[in-house]
């Protein structure tokens, strides 16, 4: 088994702790060390959403979290679960040593969301139940409990002559039973309201020359196009320099991916099933999928020459991305709430709208839209003022903070009906055509009623 860089870093940190503390009982020290790491990670993942909720922002729409599980663990829910326990048990659970303890705990009414219940009746039982000869008393207790529901279902099955599968005599599943299925991907759950004072572990200020090259590479990559300037700078300063010798493997096909790379110097060859398929040089990037989710590497990358690479890990990137999105939601939330036009939107709809908005700046005298142009965006004024003018007529309207424009072209699929020019420094939030149709919902009808080009408005 080839360990990922993330796993190697974790083990290296543990080794340093061992060398520094020189524990007498290594096993106990290891258990305490990794339990503490797990606790810190859980605290980080489950950090409170109170700041966001106080602003009316829904960070993770549709996610019920452990609250839903506790509700499901109520007496009524458990009763329903017991009725279905035997007939609808997962088909592979009997052969899975990792899931056996979950079944046993649920049978005894344990709440799987409570971190304290994972440390159960016997030392180590919560961590090592099932299949590994640990926590045996807990397993025996689960096996000797009399389940009247199971007996009742058994008698029904016998009457119908339906053979009942035995977990004792069943043959274990073959190791490659899932080999032809599509590989799954995953990603960590993060809570961005915990990031206020967070600094990336590998944060280092880059030189002007390094910044120039890295900004060019980052700027043309689709993952970073929508980041604001502060987030882009944070990404660049979080990149870690890696020196790779000629012939050294950088990533291996099928391995877990957790790093994104930018080539500063040298060339990298890519192989698919031992067949060379591509070569990248300075300024190129690879490994983008690793920043989005934990997916296996699609190819093998080998340094064709000595290389200087810059690497960014997935967790750092996602923290930067979510921190920026979180701040953006908080920033736009009060602004969107203050607009009479958007009062009909729910908190959830406002959160989605805030995510889709982009910020643009204009200096006094600069045109935002021009009469006759194709309309692609809807605009909301965050601060500043602008004039609306028409050819042959002159200025027809003056706009200020909280006003909007650009809706006519999107509502009626027409060219721009007027020119909007900034009269002071202007900051606007823009929404693209697809977002306008998809996210504004009932607001679109209000805009139609106020459309100045309507026949009954003339």
UniProtKB/Swiss-Prot annotation:
What's one GO-annotated cellular component?
Answer: cAMP-dependent protein kinase complex
- Database matches in PROSITE patterns: CNMP_BINDING_1, CNMP_BINDING_2, CNMP_BINDING_3
Source superkingdom: Eukaryota
> What ranges does the record give for the region Dimerization and phosphorylation, renumbered to this chain?
28-222
Q: Name one GO biological process term.
A: adenylate cyclase-activating G protein-coupled receptor signaling pathway
Q: Which GO terms describe its molecular function?
A: cAMP binding; cAMP-dependent protein kinase inhibitor activity; identical protein binding; protein kinase A catalytic subunit binding
Listed A to Z, the keywords are: cAMP, cAMP-binding, Nucleotide-binding, Phosphoprotein, Repeat
Q: Can you tell me which residues bind 3',5'-cyclic AMP 2? A: 341-457
Q: Which residues carry this modification: Phosphoserine?
A: 184
Give residues annotated as binding 3',5'-cyclic AMP 1.
Answer: 223-338
Q: Which family does it belong to?
A: Belongs to the cAMP-dependent kinase regulatory chain family.
**Self-association or partners: how does it assemble?**
Tetramer, composed of 2 regulatory (R) and 2 catalytic (C) subunits. In the presence of cAMP it dissociates into 2 active monomeric C subunits and an R dimer.
| Protein known as | cAMP-dependent protein kinase regulatory subunit
Species: Eremothecium gossypii (strain ATCC 10895 / CBS 109.51 / FGSC 9923 / NRRL Y-1056)
Lineage here is: Eukaryota, Fungi, Dikarya, Ascomycota, Saccharomycotina
């Amino acid at each position: 088994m080839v360990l990922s860089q993330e796993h190697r870093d974790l083990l290296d940190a543990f080794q340093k702790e061992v060398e520094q503390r020189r524990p007498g009982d290594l096993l106990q020290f290891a258990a305490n060390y990794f339990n503490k790491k797990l606790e810190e990670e859980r605290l980080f993942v489950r950090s409170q959403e109170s700041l966001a909720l106080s602003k009316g922002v829904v960070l993770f729409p549709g996610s019920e979290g452990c609250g839903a599980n506790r509700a499901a663990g109520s007496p009524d829910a458990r009763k329903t679960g017991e009725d279905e326990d035997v007939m609808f048990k997962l088909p592979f659970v009997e052969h899975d040593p990792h899931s056996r303890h979950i079944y046993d705990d649920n049978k005894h009414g344990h709440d799987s969301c409570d971190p304290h219940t994972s440390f159960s009746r016997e030392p180590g039982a919560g961590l090592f139940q099932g299949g590994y000869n640990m926590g045996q008393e807990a397993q025996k207790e689960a096996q000797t409990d009399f389940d009247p529901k199971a007996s009742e279902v058994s008698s029904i099955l016998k009457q119908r002559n339906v053979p009942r599968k035995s977990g004792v005599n069943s043959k274990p599943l073959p190791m490659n039973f899932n080999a032809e299925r599509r590989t799954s991907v995953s990603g960590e759950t993060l809570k961005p309201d915990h990031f206020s004072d967070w600094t990336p572990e590998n944060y280092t200020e880059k030189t002007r020359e390094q910044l120039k090259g890295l900004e060019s590479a980052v700027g043309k990559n689709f993952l970073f196009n929508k980041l604001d300037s502060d987030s882009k700078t944070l990404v660049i300063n979080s990149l870690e320099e890696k020196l790779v010798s000629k012939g050294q493997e950088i990533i291996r096909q099928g391995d877990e991916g957790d790093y994104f790379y930018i080539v500063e110097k040298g060339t990298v060859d890519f192989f698919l099933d031992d067949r060379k398929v591509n070569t990248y040089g300075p300024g190129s990037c690879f490994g983008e999928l690793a920043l989005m989710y934990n997916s296996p590497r699609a190819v093998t990358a080998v340094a064709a020459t000595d290389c200087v690479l810059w690497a960014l890990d997935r967790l750092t990137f996602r923290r930067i991305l979510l921190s920026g999105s979180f701040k953006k939601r908080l920033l736009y939330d009060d602004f969107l709430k203050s607009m009479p036009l958007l009062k009909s939107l729910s908190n959830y709809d406002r959160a989605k709208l805030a995510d889709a908005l982009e910020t643009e700046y204009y200096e006094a005298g600069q045109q935002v839209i021009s009469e006759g142009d194709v309309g692609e965006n809807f605009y909301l004024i965050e601060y500043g003022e602008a004039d609306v003018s028409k050819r042959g007529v002159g200025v027809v309207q003056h706009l200020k903070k909280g006003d909007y424009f650009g809706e006519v072209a999107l509502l009626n699929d027409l060219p721009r009906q007027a020119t909007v020019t900034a009269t002071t420094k202007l900051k606007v939030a823009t929404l693209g055509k697809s977002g306008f149709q998809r996210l504004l919902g009932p607001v679109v009808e209000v805009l139609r009623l106020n459309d100045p080009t309507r026949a009954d408005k003339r």
